[in-house]
C-alpha cells in the first residue's frame, strides 16, 4: 500500500528502527549490553543480574539527557559518530588525490577534495560528541555510585566505566586509523 517514494523511505526507516530496538532488547536481556533510551521512552534497559554495575553509566546518560540543554544536544549529535566516519571514509576512498598544481572545479569537487585532504581530522572530529557524552555519562555515574555505594563497590563501578570508556576511545582511534590508512593505500594503488 506504499504510494510514494517518501512513504517507502519512512517505512524503511520505521522497520530499521524497530529492528535495532529488538536487537538492543535481546542483547540487554542476555546481559551483553545496556542501553538508555532517550526521548519519550526515557528508560534504561539492562540485565542487573549480569551487568549490575552498568546501570550507573546508563543513569549518567539519563542525567545528560534530562539535566541540561547542552548535554541533550551533545547526545543528539552522536549520530555524527555513526554517519560521519562512513561518509568521510567513502569520500576519501573514492576521491582521487589531486596531482601537484591541479585545481578544483566546482563546489562538489572542492568539497570532496577538502574532505579527502582532511579525512583523518574529520573522522576523529566526528567522534567528539559521542566521546564527550559517553565520558560525561561515566563521570556522572561514578559520582552517583560514590554517593550511594560502599567504597569497594564504587571502585568497581569506576573500573567498569574506565573499561567502557577505553572501548569508545579505541574504537574512535581504530576507525580514524582505518580511514587514514585506507585512503593512503588507495592513493598508492591509484598511482601504480
Features from the language model and the residues they span:
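Active-site recognition of the HExxH zinc-binding catalytic motif
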Residues: 50-67
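Auxiliary, metal-adjacent structural segments of Zn-dependent hydrolase domains
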Residues: 1-52
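Sequence-level detector for tyrosine residue identity
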Residues: 35-36, 41, 57, 163, ...
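ATP-binding/phosphotransfer module of carbohydrate and carboxylate kinases, centering on a glycine-rich
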Residues: 71-72
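Long, well-structured alpha-helical subdomains associated
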Residues: 80-135, 139, 144-192
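Generic hydrophobic/packing signal
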Residues: 35-36, 43, 56, 138-141, ...
Amino acid at each position: 500500500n506504499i504510494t510514494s517514494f517518501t512513504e517507502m523511505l519512512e517505512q524503511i526507516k520505521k522497520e530499521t528502527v524497530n529492528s535495532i530496538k529488538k536487537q538492543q532488547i535481546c542483547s540487554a536481556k542476555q546481559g551483553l549490553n545496556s542501553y538508555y533510551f532517550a526521548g519519550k521512552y526515557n528508560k534504561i534497559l539492562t540485565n542487573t543480574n549480569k551487568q549490575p554495575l552498568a546501570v550507573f553509566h546508563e543513569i549518567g546518560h539519563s542525567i545528560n539527557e534530562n539535566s541540561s540543554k547542552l548535554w541533550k544536544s551533545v547526545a543528539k549529535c552522536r549520530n555524527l559518530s555513526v554517519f560521519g566516519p562512513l561518509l568521510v571514509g567513502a569520500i576519501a576512498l573514492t576521491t582521487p588525490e589531486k596531482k601537484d598544481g591541479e585545481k578544483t572545479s566546482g563546489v562538489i569537487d572542492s568539497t570532496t577534495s577538502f574532505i579527502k585532504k582532511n579525512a583523518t581530522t574529520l573522522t576523529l572530529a566526528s567522534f567528539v560528541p559521542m566521546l564527550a557524552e559517553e565520558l560525561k555519562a561515566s563521570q556522572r555515574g561514578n559520582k552517583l555510585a560514590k554517593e550511594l555505594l560502599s567504597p569497594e563497590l564504587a571502585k568497581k563501578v569506576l573500573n567498569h566505566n574506565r573499561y567502557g570508556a577505553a572501548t569508545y576511545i579505541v574504537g574512535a582511534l581504530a576507525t580514524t586509523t582505518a580511514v587514514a590508512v585506507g585512503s593512503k593505500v588507495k592513493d598508492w594503488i591509484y598511482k601504480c
